[in-house]
């Protein structure tokens, strides 16, 4: 005879009814969490750090101002603790009937329903114990639909206690089959237990519906970007740009490496030239100066976490853009560490809004996506910036084992990973105009970076020949010298042509090249043809 005895929800969720008071359980994607939520003045609030880390990273805590900032594509909103209403970066104020941000026992909380209204989540409230069942994932999952009113049991058997009654039509997550009679499910209220197999439908797959879709306003160019970097280490070098461009064709954007963060206050060092900009505009080229983080005297953790410093840098960049007439910026911040990545992302949000308001295209350079640099959060960047530039090189680098700088599989893997997170029309893949000449001797490996022609000259001077390597999509040669065994994986017309086929395959937004001056002139038509084919 089946038992109808019910297990207490307090026992199942291992919580004490006497201690419940204003606290509430949070079940996040089927994980039971304690002390993350509480009711304050009759409203449910969640810990801000929990929200930022797990639910919506745009609710960012700004340490300097002791406020929570929320950004959409058009504005940054500031919420001060225990104050009704909020304001945007232009000083506009907005009223609320409750405090969006509250503090309790030294902890900062966010009003749940306010946060949920701008988050792509689904949720349910349940009682005994009071709890919030919260789902943030939108990946395909297995489900069943309950076919008749039934019960979910603690164990797979009719003598096991009842966790919950479920009605016909209830959709449950399917965990797995126990035997021919019982299946394991997760109910909408957060119970994980067992139902009779004949009480549920066959298993099917479903993707949770989006509950919130933000409207983006990217400032895309409307054509395939062909951007080349022009490395400038001193201001006088700007005068030589015409020489560098003599045999160049097909580019529509140039990025001179003019700016670097000077200090932790938001000041810049500049190598800018108004003559250069006028010259490029006369040629029909857009100018997106590069800004780097290569000054190792700057405490970047402190810089990114300071709203004052971030704002000063952004204001300085906007002033430079107005003064010189730039068309955009290229951000090349390569030393972002995981412990201040949230602050870096907030900087990009704030910079993107300033660029939108000033008609500037914002592109951001990123490493080939990998687990170790996942904190760069390409998907989140793409919500705000216009173009994500993947640096599709440095597969092997100074100090590594000998190998290709940018083999075809390496490049395609980077592109494939990027477009899985970023709309393809926002992705620009950068190709190298350089390679490395590797020398191995007595177990020691050394290399030097050279341009396309210099690599071919080295091979010819040593009487060597190269053979096409299908695996890397490059010509390869090796020869012996008095210094040791030399290996070269070449970048030239054919290898670049193979890479350009990927632009059509993945429908990318454009190409970039590092760097102007290292190429052979014939490669420009290869790149242009590849982009035209991709259009």
Question: Which residue stretches match the model-derived regions?
Answer:
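Primary recognition of N-terminal secretory signal peptides and signal-anchoring hydrophobic helices
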Residues: 1-179, 201, 208-221
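Substrate-binding surface in catalytic domains of secreted glycosidases
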Residues: 264-271, 315, 338-462
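Glycan-binding loop/region signatures in secreted carbohydrate-active enzymes
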Residues: 210-211, 433-501, 523, 531-535
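Short, acidic/polar
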Residues: 233-248, 306-322, 370-381, 491-504
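Glycan-recognition patch characteristic of GH18 chitinases/ENGases
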Residues: 207-316
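SH3/SH3-like beta-barrel fold
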Residues: 169, 182-187, 195
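Conserved, mostly hydrophobic/aromatic
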Residues: 254, 331, 388, 429, ...
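Non-catalytic accessory regions flanking glycosidase/transglycosidase catalytic cores in CAZymes
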Residues: 162-171, 201-253, 357, 364, ...
């Amino acid at each position: 005879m089946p038992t109808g005895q019910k297990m207490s929800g307090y026992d199942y969720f291992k919580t004490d009814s006497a201690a419940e008071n204003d606290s509430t359980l949070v079940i996040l994607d089927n994980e039971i969490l304690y002390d993350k939520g509480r009711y304050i003045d009759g409203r449910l609030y969640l810990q801000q750090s929990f929200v930022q880390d797990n639910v919506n990273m745009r609710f960012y805590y700004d340490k300097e101002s002791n406020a929570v900032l929320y950004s959409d594509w058009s504005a940054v909103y500031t919420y001060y603790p225990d104050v009704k209403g909020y304001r945007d970066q232009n000083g506009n104020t907005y009223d609320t009937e409750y405090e969006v941000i509250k503090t309790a026992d030294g902890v900062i909380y966010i009003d749940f329903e306010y946060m949920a209204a701008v988050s792509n989540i689904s949720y349910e409230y349940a009682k005994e114990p009071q709890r919030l069942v919260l789902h943030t994932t939108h990946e395909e999952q297995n489900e069943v639909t309950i076919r008749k009113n039934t019960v979910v049991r603690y164990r797979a058997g009719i003598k096991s206690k009842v966790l919950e009654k479920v009605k016909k039509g209830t959709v449950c997550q399917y965990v797995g089959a126990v035997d021919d009679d019982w299946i394991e499910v997760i109910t909408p209220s957060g119970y994980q237990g067992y139902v009779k197999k004949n009480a549920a439908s066959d298993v099917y797959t479903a993707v949770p519906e989006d509950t919130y879709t933000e409207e983006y306003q990217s400032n895309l160019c409307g054509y395939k970007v062909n951007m080349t970097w022009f490395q400038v280490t001193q201001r006088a070098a700007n005068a030589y740009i015409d020489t560098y461009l003599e045999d160049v064709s097909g580019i529509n954007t140039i990025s001179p490496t003019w700016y670097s963060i000077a200090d932790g206050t938001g000041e810049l060092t500049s190598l800018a030239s108004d003559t250069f900009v006028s010259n490029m505009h006369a040629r029909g080229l857009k100018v997106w100066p590069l800004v780097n983080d290569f000054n190792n005297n700057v405490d970047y953790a402190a810089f990114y976490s300071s709203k004052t410093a971030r704002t000063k840098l952004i204001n300085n960049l906007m002033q430079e853009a107005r003064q010189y007439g730039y068309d955009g910026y290229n951000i090349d911040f390569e030393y972002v560490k995981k412990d201040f990545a949230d602050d870096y992302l907030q900087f990009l949000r704030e910079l993107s809004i300033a660029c939108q308001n000033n008609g500037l295209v914002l592109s951001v350079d990123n490493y080939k996506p990998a687990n170790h640099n996942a904190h760069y959060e390409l998907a989140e960047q793409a919500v705000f910036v216009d173009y994500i530039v993947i640096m599709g090189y440095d597969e092997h680098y100074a100090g590594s084992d000998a190998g290709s700088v940018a083999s075809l599989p390496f490049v395609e893997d980077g592109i494939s990973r990027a477009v899985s997170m970023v709309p393809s029309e926002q992705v620009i893949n950068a190709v190298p105009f350089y390679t490395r000449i590797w020398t191995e001797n007595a177990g020691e490996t050394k290399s030097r970076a050279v341009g396309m022609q210099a690599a071919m000259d080295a091979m010819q001077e040593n009487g060597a020949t190269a053979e096409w390597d299908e695996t890397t999509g490059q010509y390869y040669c090796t020869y012996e010298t008095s210094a040791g065994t030399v290996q070269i994986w070449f970048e030239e017309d054919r290898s670049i042509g193979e890479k350009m086929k990927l632009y059509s395959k993945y429908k990318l937004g454009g190409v970039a090249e590092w760097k102007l001056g290292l190429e052979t002139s014939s490669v420009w038509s290869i790149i242009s043809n590849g982009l035209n084919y991709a259009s």
